[in-house]
């Protein structure tokens, strides 16, 4: 990228490493032997960026004249998480310890305000699930999981464009249901996992049901809109169940015990329905 800002007779230039991102372990962030004037600025050599710099010379010829200044060049540290989202909110492990991390410059003011309002008012003005630091399950906090998923996300920050349902390649099959083998035999589409659980979005064996509902199943004309989830089969499955019966695997859904004197009231508020019944 070309920021277009001159500094000391030089022109700032930078790029994002999408092939082999250099991961930094948390314990090494402040290592004075590996950092420059800031923990986020790490030493950089010309050899490390020779290929992208050559492309920069082609697109911005003036860089050839300005040359390379090793003294002001650095490898910038970016915070990339295992699901590419920010980490905002109170730590699940340490009460009263609030974080607003993995936030980049363009999102800084908004995220800081959300965090501040959350701290002061006890709740955020919007749904914070995709930012909430408490969103991770124990298995997703393991070092190997964080490292491999973060590396995978770092390779696709800007290049190439990533489909919203693009499946992760690493840390798969952490948890599978008792029916997993049978589901695969039925042609289960396990492109994506949910909370570490392999979960089929539809089954190829049910494609035949499409013949009954061809006139009412929506058609997705764009290839981009058809990737990773066989929507037409899933729609046929739903319609078939509405007319008859079916079996649904719920083993990969979250199951929670809600206890306390206000448990019933809270659950009915959340679900907008009467759910208590005779439950003590």
Q: Where does each model-flagged region fall?
A:
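C-terminal catalytic lobe of FAD-dependent flavoproteins
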Residues: 39-43, 49-163, 167-171
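A structural signal for short hydrophobic beta-strand segments in well-ordered beta-sheet cores
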Residues: 2-4, 88
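Flexible loop/turn segments at secondary-structure boundaries
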Residues: 19-22, 80, 106-107, 200, ...
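Short acidic (Asp/Glu) and glycine-rich catalytic loops that position anionic groups and cofactors
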Residues: 26-35, 93-96, 158-160, 246-248
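Central beta-strand plus flanking loop segment that forms part of the substrate or channel wall
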Residues: 1, 54, 254
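Hydrophobic residues at beta-strand termini and immediately following loops
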Residues: 13, 100, 258
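Glycine/proline-enriched, intrinsically flexible loops and inter-domain linkers
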Residues: 137-280
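Conserved FAD/dinucleotide-binding core of flavoprotein oxidoreductases
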Residues: 5-58, 103
């Amino acid at each position: 990228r070309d920021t277009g800002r001159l500094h000391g007779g030089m022109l700032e230039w930078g790029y994002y490493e999408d092939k082999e991102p250099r991961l930094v372990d948390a314990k090494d962030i402040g290592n004075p032997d590996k950092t420059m004037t800031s923990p986020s600025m790490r030493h950089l050599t010309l050899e490390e960026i020779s290929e992208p710099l050559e492309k920069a010379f082609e697109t911005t010829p003036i860089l050839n004249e300005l040359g390379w200044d090793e003294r002001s060049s650095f490898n910038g540290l970016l915070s990339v998480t295992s699901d590419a989202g920010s980490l905002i909110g109170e730590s699940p492990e340490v009460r009263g310890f609030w974080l607003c991390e993995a936030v980049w410059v363009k999102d800084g003011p908004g995220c800081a305000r959300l965090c501040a309002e959350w701290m002061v008012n006890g709740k955020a003005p919007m749904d914070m699930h995709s930012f909430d630091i408490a969103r991770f399950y124990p298995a997703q906090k393991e070092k190997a999981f964080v490292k491999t998923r973060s590396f995978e996300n770092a390779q696709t920050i800007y290049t190439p464009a990533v489909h919203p349902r693009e499946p992760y390649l690493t840390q798969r099959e952490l948890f599978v249901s008792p029916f997993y083998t049978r589901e695969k035999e039925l042609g289960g589409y396990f492109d994506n996992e949910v909370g570490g659980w392999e979960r089929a979005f539809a089954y190829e064996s049910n494609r035949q049901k499409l013949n009954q509902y061809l006139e009412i199943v929506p058609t997705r004309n764009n290839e981009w809109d058809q990737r990773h989830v066989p929507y037409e089969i899933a729609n046929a499955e739903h319609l078939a169940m509405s007319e008859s019966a079916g079996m649904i695997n719920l083993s990969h859904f979250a199951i929670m015990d809600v206890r306390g004197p206000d448990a019933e009231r809270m659950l009915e508020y959340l679900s907008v329905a009467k759910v208590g019944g005779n439950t003590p």
